[in-house]
Amino acid sequence: MDISISWVVIILLVLSYLILMEKWRAAKLPKNLPPGPPKLPVIGHLHLLGGGLPQHVLRGITQKYGPVAHVQLGEVSSVVLSSTEAARQAMKVLDPAFADRFVNIGSRIMWYDSEDIIFSRYNDHWRQIRKICVSELLSPKNVKSFGYIRQDEMARLIRLFESSEGAAINVSEEISKTVCTIVSRVAFGSVVKDQSLLLNLVKESLRMASGFELADLFPSSWLLNLLCFNKYRLWGMRRRLDNFLDGFLEEHRVKKSGEYGGEDIIDVLYRMQKDSQMKVPITNNGIKGFIYDVFSAGTDTSAATILWALSELMRNPEKMAKAQAEVREILKGKTNVDMAEVHELKYLRSVVKEALRLHPPFPIIPRLCIQESEVTGYTIPANTRILINVWSIGRDPLYWNEPDTFNPDRYDEVPRDIIGNDFELIPFGSGRRICPGLHFGLANIEVPLAQLLYHFDWKLPQGMTAADIDMTEKPGLSGPRKNPLILVPTIHNPTS
């Protein structure tokens, strides 16, 4: 009995301490903080996140409390931005104050202590690696030079689909493999031997790293940090990733040049590593972190967008017919298809825009406010986590007519770009932290999609209708389809 009473006293003392800390933190917050839902003691609004995907839940909050809303997730103060104007102020007007990135357990472990570019803090390391990326690695000129790789791999995929004509195929699996091979050849100069292992590592780590860990939301609690079992699983995956990358990088170092000749991304990074003029030394972990960025952001997101575009076209046969008519008219008789040819495909590019609007590769863009700022009249304290709900902005009825409807024709009336200038459509972000692989990613989406629409007519498996296509999203950083897309290809005969 005495032991039971002692435990009750301890629990009450701990709860009292947490409630007092909560009141102390609340007293320090500015009076003009954005509005938000009523919160519970200790956990704040954490209980609200159990009702669906984060982008959906946060949209529900901002629809009720306004496009700029405050959410308290445990000890962590966060502000959700779900309007074009709020995003414009944070990513353009006040860009330096919102250019930092907060780091959680998953990103710290899998992305090499933020020595990569995606999760790097806003510092000299980030400025240097971004400059290298934009000028040396993924510039439009370099992306264009990778065209022969895209052509090779699409020719292989087309042969595979031709050999399976009339049969139901897991299109999701084959497109993921193809995009992974393209990225592999660009990054490593050759095809990765254990490509399926790397692809599975990327997908699983993205899934695990995208979740909320209690230890992240209660950073002062050593106990929650100790009991964060997902952290130990992530470290296990990190060791597997290290073994894989260390072995491949050593092979690459010995081989000196890629399988296909020329200088690949690793060659450039090794060259920069030896450059004594570098302000911040490039470490081996930095190289591995960047390579992991290329695979995690370049493979999963590009494949997911192609699959969402195909899914939407299959649900809208008239849009599919229009896209195929354009592709087959403009590409007729052309043996090599890459960025120059795709640039002529106005409607196909609108299809991609619309797929990115409805299914952005990163539904929520995380930022960190590093100095007290004012957004749409509300005060955002320093060290507040910012969650820019790109998914919600792309479905805002103030800017989009019938926002939940797939309609590529809408861009004929109001052209919008996707390179960060039009804040109604920011699938790759904007400002200093805009995705540096934007051009590489678009090439790996538009070129394969054009080829698939040119060479094949697509049908659903027997017994399925357009209404049966499952459009459910899966949790993850890239917002992929929950279930694979199964389609039946029929070879298109231009002479028939």
Curated annotation (Swiss-Prot):
State which residue ranges cross the membrane. Answer: 1-21
Q: Kindly report the pH dependence of this protein's activity.
A: Optimum pH is 6.8-7.
| CDD domains from the UniProt entry | CYP71-like (cd11072)
**Which keywords appear in this protein's UniProt record, sorted alphabetically?**
Heme, Iron, Membrane, Metal-binding, Monooxygenase, Oxidoreductase, Signal-anchor, Transmembrane, Transmembrane helix
Kindly list the places in or outside the cell where this protein is found, as annotated in its UniProt entry.
Membrane
One annotated GO molecular function:
iron ion binding
Query: Which co-factor is required?
Result: heme
Q: What is the native source organism of this protein?
A: Origanum vulgare (Wild marjoram)
- Protein purpose: Involved in the biosynthesis of phenolic monoterpenes natural products thymol and carvacrol which have a broad range of biological activities acting as antimicrobial compounds, insecticides, antioxidants and pharmaceutical agents. Catalyzes the C2- and C3-hydroxylation of gamma-terpinene to produce carvacrol and thymol, respectively. Also mediates the C6-hydroxylation of (4S)-limonene to form carveol and the C3-hydroxylation of (4R)-limonene to generate (+)-trans-isopiperitenol.
- PROSITE patterns recorded for this chain? CYTOCHROME_P450
Q: Which Pfam families match?
A: p450 (PF00067)
Catalytic reaction annotation = (4S)-limonene + reduced [NADPH--hemoprotein reductase] + O2 = (1S,5R)-carveol + oxidized [NADPH--hemoprotein reductase] + H2O + H(+); gamma-terpinene + 2 reduced [NADPH--hemoprotein reductase] + 2 O2 = carvacrol + 2 oxidized [NADPH--hemoprotein reductase] + 3 H2O + 2 H(+); gamma-terpinene + 2 reduced [NADPH--hemoprotein reductase] + 2 O2 = thymol + 2 oxidized [NADPH--hemoprotein reductase] + 3 H2O + 2 H(+); (4R)-limonene + reduced [NADPH--hemoprotein reductase] + O2 = (1R,6S)-isopiperitenol + oxidized [NADPH--hemoprotein reductase] + H2O + H(+)
* The protein's name in its UniProt record: Cytochrome P450 71D178
Assigned EC number: 1.14.14.-, 1.14.14.51
